[in-house]
């Protein structure tokens, strides 16, 4: 999917920053770099729409998953959770 050349607004839940502080620095820096690029195109990368969730997506990032909501009308991305990959986080 493509969007217009206008970038999206990015909002990051404070809990995400807490999660980043608890994981190895190299992983946290890589995840933060991915999050910072999301306003260019939130549909880019290894993403999957979450079943049963209207606007929730997850992006695979190494051993972690970034969960976020896309509000297309407002052109807003809300990153609300980062979790290590498990059988429950795909």
What are these regions (language model features)?
Residues 1-10, 18-22, 26-29, 44, ...:
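Enriched for short, Lys/Arg-rich terminal
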Residues 34-59:
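A short, surface-exposed loop/turn module that caps and links secondary-structure elements
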């Amino acid at each position: 999917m493509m969007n217009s050349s206008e970038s999206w607004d990015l909002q990051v839940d404070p809990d995400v920053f807490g999660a980043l502080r608890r994981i190895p620095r190299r992983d946290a820096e890589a995840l933060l770099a991915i999050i910072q690029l999301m306003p260019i195109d939130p549909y880019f990368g290894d993403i999957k729409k979450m079943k049963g969730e209207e606007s929730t997506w997850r992006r695979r990032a190494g051993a972690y998953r970034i969960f976020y909501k896309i509000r297309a009308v407002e052109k807003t991305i809300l990153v609300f959770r980062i979790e290590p990959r498990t059988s429950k986080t795909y």
